[in-house]
């Protein structure tokens, strides 16, 4: 059986793993491809410490983002209801529909915080009334907001 070499990946490689992973590869693969192209580094105690520090920083940053998402979720629930004005025909049906972009604009106007419209799920809204939209603020944090559609 051939000897394997342990390397630390400096970028994600689909067949091996993601950045920062320690993997064992064939010596030729490491020597001829991974190391010369900067896709991996030889494992040394200094490299291990560097990877550990980087993972700690990433964890702190991820925790901070999650806390910001939780705070924004609380702010959204405190506001309660967002009003969207749309034109209505004589039969009470909207001209067009309420889109996730409309909801994002209403939230941005009320909270002064930008939100990506692609993270908002809105039911099909063709009439006036109250509806609920779902927002993905973070992979672990979701929020629901009430929308009031008026003319």
UniProtKB/Swiss-Prot annotation:
Ribosomal protein recorded as keyword: yes
Any single GO BP term: translation
One annotated GO molecular function: rRNA binding
Annotated S-S bridges: none
Keyword Ribonucleoprotein included in the entry's annotation: yes
UniProt KW keywords: Ribonucleoprotein, Ribosomal protein, RNA-binding, rRNA-binding
Listed Pfam families: Ribosomal_L9_C, Ribosomal_L9_N
Cellular component aspect of the GO annotation: ribonucleoprotein complex; ribosome
Xref: InterPro entries: Ribosomal_bL9, Ribosomal_bL9/RNase_H1_N, Ribosomal_bL9_bac/chp, Ribosomal_bL9_C, Ribosomal_bL9_C_sf, Ribosomal_bL9_N, Ribosomal_bL9_N_sf
SUPFAM superfamilies xrefs: L9 N-domain-like, Ribosomal protein L9 C-domain
Highest taxon in the source lineage: Bacteria
NCBIfam families given in the database record: L9
Entries under PANTHER family matching the protein: 50S RIBOSOMAL PROTEIN L9
Family as reported in the entry's similarity comment: Belongs to the bacterial ribosomal protein bL9 family.
Role noted for this protein: Binds to the 23S rRNA.
Record-given protein name: Large ribosomal subunit protein bL9
Species assigned in the record: Prochlorococcus marinus (strain MIT 9312)
């Amino acid at each position: 059986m051939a000897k394997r070499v342990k390397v630390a990946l400096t970028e994600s490689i689909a067949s091996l793993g993601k950045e920062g992973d320690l993997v064992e590869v064939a010596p030729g693969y490491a020597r001829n491809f991974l190391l010369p192209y900067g896709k991996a580094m030889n494992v040394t105690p200094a490299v291990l410490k560097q990877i550990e520090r980087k993972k700690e920083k990433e964890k702190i940053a991820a925790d901070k983002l999650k806390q910001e998402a939780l705070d924004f979720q609380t702010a959204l629930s405190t506001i309660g209801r967002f009003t969207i004005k749309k034109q209505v025909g004589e039969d009470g049906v909207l001209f067009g529909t309420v889109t996730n972009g409309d909801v994002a604009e209403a939230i941005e106007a009320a909270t002064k915080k930008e939100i990506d419209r692609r993270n908002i799920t809105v039911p099909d809204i063709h009439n006036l009334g109250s509806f609920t939209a779902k927002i993905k603020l973070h992979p672990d944090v979701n929020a629901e907001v009430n929308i009031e559609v008026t003319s």
